């Protein structure tokens, strides 16, 4: 399957809101209360919020497409790291999601590779992220890319505070 990866623009805000909400719901609906999931989606995946993030100079969205169909996305966020993240200039992968029809096609690997390339090109020495401790599929994916656990943090979905593992890997 062929696909392209490009930087998203503010014109992609509605598309990213819909894709983000769908992929988050697909990944976490079975393990969260419907009201918590609905609250999280409403507060994190509106077109207005996506547009605000797209215009933020500290954020960069990478959008993977196959024949013009959105297949997945990643959000790189240049922000202060969680405690325990090493390096002088770490960069966060805040989101990396692949739409269910594209699981197993290489889209996730291509997005990760592009995230690493972008981080290196911008002079970052470490890349880090948070992953839910119960998301074994994602944890296995990140382990294959050389990420190791460096800490933990709390991620709130609605009224449910969950434990996320903080993972990092050097870019050298």
Regions picked out by a protein language model, each given a short descriptive name:
Residues 111, 135-138:
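Conserved short alpha-helix immediately C-terminal to the canonical SAM/SAH-binding motif I
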Residues 81, 128-131, 143, 148-165:
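Conserved catalytic-core motifs of GNAT/GCN5-like acyltransferases
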Residues 3, 7-13, 17-31, 35-103, ...:
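Acetyl-CoA-dependent GNAT
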Residues 98, 132-133:
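Short amphipathic helical patch at the helix-1/turn junction of helix-turn-helix
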Residues 14, 139-140:
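Alpha-helical segments flanking ligand/cofactor-binding loops in enzyme cores
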């Amino acid at each position: 399957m062929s696909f392209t990866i490009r930087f998203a623009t503010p014109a992609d805000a509605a598309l990213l809101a819909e894709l983000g909400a769908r992929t988050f719901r697909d990944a976490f609906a079975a393990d969260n209360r419907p009201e918590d999931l609905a609250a999280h989606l409403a507060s994190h995946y509106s077109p207005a919020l996506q547009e605000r993030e797209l215009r933020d100079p500290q954020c960069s969205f990478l959008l993977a497409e196959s024949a013009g169909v959105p297949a997945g996305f990643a959000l790189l966020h240049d922000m202060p790291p969680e405690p325990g993240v090493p390096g002088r200039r770490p960069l966060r992968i805040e989101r990396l999601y692949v739409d269910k029809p594209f699981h197993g096609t290489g889209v996730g690997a291509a997005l990760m590779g592009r995230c690493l390339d972008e981080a290196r090109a911008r002079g970052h020495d470490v890349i880090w992220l948070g992953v839910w401790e119960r998301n074994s599929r994602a944890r296995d994916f990140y382990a294959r890319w050389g990420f190791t656990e460096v800490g933990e943090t709390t991620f709130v979905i609605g009224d449910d505070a969950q434990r996320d593992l903080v993972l990092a890997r050097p870019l050298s």
